[in-house]
Amino acid sequence: MEETQQNDQKMEFRALCEEFRANNQIPPEKFDLYQVKRGLRNPDGTGVMAGLTLICNVHGYLIDDAERIPDKGILTYRGINVEDIVEGCRRENRFGFEEVAWLLLFGKQPTRSQLEGFSKLLNSCRELPEYFAEDMIIKAPSRNIMNKLGRSVLALYSYDDNPDDPFLENNMRQAIQLIARLPTIMTYA
């Protein structure tokens, strides 16, 4: 495409954006009137509670006299500081991937026997569907690895013989297969 045509397109896109802005802006006072949070933030910048979970927590600030004060960030999985998990893995010279996956799924650290069985199960589920790596990852490159991971996860739906079954056993199978396959997908991505 020649430069003049590209410039014309840019100008047309800008004009369309202005038209869009003129007819799609919600006045800020409406958010206050209807108590709607923008971007999952309160007016003071603190996060909005969007749900309850036992899986993880992120601590990044304190509230003192209605003022948000930054604090050392702490990420916990199932009540365990992630820094402690990492330190334990370093100290014992282990990877920790399977152990953390178990912790996130089942709410407690696995016994040695549970971890061995879980690792074997993950190993048996690591293989990607035939031609998946070539067709979905290698032939469709992306500069953004998160985009590549997202696309790959969505594409796996097409290879699942029972993708919409809502029961726990099926959801567990899907979760285990995703956990097992993501490291393989990342290496191709």
What are the residue ranges of the model-derived segments?
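Hydrophobic alpha-helical bundle cores within soluble ligand-binding/oligomerization subdomains
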Residues: 2-189
